[in-house]
């Protein structure tokens, strides 16, 4: 069997911790990716789809009313304007093209919030691939509009009832299916995590976010931003934003994990700052686990950040101090969801609202002229019913408290 062409590790994190049966499939994927990156016709087709189907480049918008401090400009990288509604579409198109290049006829995917499932379904419809999406039964209930979208575009949505019936269980089932079908199917992983070469592939197919941002901010401001800020679940939108800035020491890289109901409670999803290194989902990375080493449930109001681990490159950037990772609570994200809608007429995804919350916190404390760029990773249409229910429940609670 061929040797690996790329380094599977980021410092001590990453690797390829999978059953032996999957190693040939991962090596085949790595080879196809390396060759595709050097193939002008592949790059041309990917670039064409990004431009003429997905709608790149996306805008870099200076907020008019969001910044609480006259010294601070807050820009939004508008991945919410991408076809499909979120940054997910970028790398899904890249991986679907890779699958076709390898002669695969079928795509297997997992999804939590349904955004990755929708992106996978649209890419499969466009490129004529059969599509199977594994989704936790709980998430199917929480995200019915996205389930319908996937089915409408021809995907088969398979409910997962094992474990906690959420994303980590869907990941396990998708991986199990792929083990039995990798000769004809490609597993289209939805984030910059999992076994090598997925973290590298996903980063490279998302890195145009940061590349465009750099070019756009230089045109608008004549200098680089002081910080780029992105929410972190598995970490694909954040690594897409960070990748082109890693070698720019003047730019601070800030990832925002979900603090849920509070970091001091068990109800959060912040493994980078509060987890222990372990093996999960084919990689070595920080993990939320109990004292017996069992994986603990992560929690976040946003289904897309509800993941008990994190991509290995983020773990490495954190370990070497190149990026710093903060957190925002459910309440802060809900507040920012409403604030951006009222201040700017933009409804952000609950995931992205975590990054916005930290940016506004940072802006309040600034004492000199500062430029912040927030990756607005997706739009909030998928979240309006969730938020409406939460706000209604809060209002009822207040009213009963006032009586």
Swiss-Prot record:
| Keywords assigned by UniProt, alphabetized | Amino-acid biosynthesis, Aromatic amino acid biosynthesis, Lyase, Pyridoxal phosphate, Tryptophan biosynthesis
Matching entries from Pfam families are given as: PALP (PF00291)
The record's section on InterPro entries has:
Trp_synth_b_CS, Trp_synth_beta, Trp_synth_beta/beta-like, TrpB-like_PALP, TrpB-like_PALP_sf
State its cofactor: pyridoxal 5'-phosphate
Look up the domain of life of the source. Answer: Bacteria
Q: Which enzyme class, named as a word?
A: lyase
Catalytic activity, per the record? Answer: (1S,2R)-1-C-(indol-3-yl)glycerol 3-phosphate + L-serine = D-glyceraldehyde 3-phosphate + L-tryptophan + H2O
User: What GO CC annotations are associated with the protein?
Assistant: cytoplasm
What are the EC numbers?
4.2.1.20
Biochemical pathway: Amino-acid biosynthesis; L-tryptophan biosynthesis; L-tryptophan from chorismate: step 5/5
Q: Which GO terms describe its molecular function?
A: tryptophan synthase activity
Q: Extract the CDD domains matched here.
A: Trp-synth_B
Q: According to the UniProt entry, which residues carry N6-(pyridoxal phosphate)lysine?
A: 88
Subunit architecture: Tetramer of two alpha and two beta chains.
Function comment: The beta subunit is responsible for the synthesis of L-tryptophan from indole and L-serine.
Into which family does the record put it? Belongs to the TrpB family.
Protein name as catalogued: Tryptophan synthase beta chain
Q: Which organism is it from?
A: Shewanella frigidimarina (strain NCIMB 400)
């Amino acid at each position: 069997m061929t040797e690996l062409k790329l380094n599977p590790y980021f410092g001590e994190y990453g690797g390829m911790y999978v059953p032996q049966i999957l190693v040939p499939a991962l090596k085949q994927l790595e080879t196809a990716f390396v060759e595709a990156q050097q193939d002008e016709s592949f790059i041309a087709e990917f670039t064409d789809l990004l431009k003429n189907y997905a709608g790149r480049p996306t805008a870099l918008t200076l907020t008019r009313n969001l910044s609480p401090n006259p010294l601070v400009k807050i820009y939004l990288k508008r991945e919410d304007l991408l076809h499909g509604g979120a940054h997910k579409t970028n790398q899904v198109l890249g991986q679907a093209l890779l699958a076709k290049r390898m002669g695969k006829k079928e795509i297997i995917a997992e999804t939590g919030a349904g955004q990755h499932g929708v992106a996978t379904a649209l890419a499969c419809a466009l490129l004529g691939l059969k599509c199977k999406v594994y989704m936790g039964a709980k998430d199917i209930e929480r995200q019915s509009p996205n389930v319908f979208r996937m089915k409408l575009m021809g995907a088969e949505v398979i409910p997962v009832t094992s474990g906690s019936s959420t994303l980590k269980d869907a990941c396990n089932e998708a991986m199990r299916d792929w083990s039995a079908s990798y000769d004809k199917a490609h597993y289209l992983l939805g984030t910059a995590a999992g076994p090598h070469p997925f973290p590298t592939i996903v980063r490279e197919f998302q890195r145009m976010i940061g590349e465009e941002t750099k070019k756009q901010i230089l045109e608008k401001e004549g200098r680089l931003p002081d910080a780029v800020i992105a929410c972190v679940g598995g970490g694909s939108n954040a690594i897409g934003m960070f990748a082109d800035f890693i070698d720019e020491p003047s730019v601070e890289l800030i990832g925002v994990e979900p603090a849920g109901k509070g970091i001091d409670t068990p109800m959060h999803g912040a493994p980078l700052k509060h987890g222990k290194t372990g093996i999960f989902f084919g990689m070595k990375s920080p993990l939320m686990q109990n004292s017996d080493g069992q994986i603990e449930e992560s929690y976040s109001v946003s289904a897309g950040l509800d993941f008990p681990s994190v991509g290995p490159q983020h773990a490495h950037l954190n370990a070497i101090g190149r990026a710093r990772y903060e957190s925002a609570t459910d309440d802060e994200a809900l507040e920012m969801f409403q604030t951006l809608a009222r201040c700017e007429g933009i409804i952000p995804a609950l995931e992205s609202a975590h990054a916005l919350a930290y940016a506004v916190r940072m802006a309040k404390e600034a004492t000199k002229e500062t430029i912040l760029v927030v990756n607005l990773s997706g739009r909030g249409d998928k979240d309006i019913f969730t938020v409406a229910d939460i706000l209604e429940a809060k209002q009822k609670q207040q009213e009963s408290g006032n009586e």
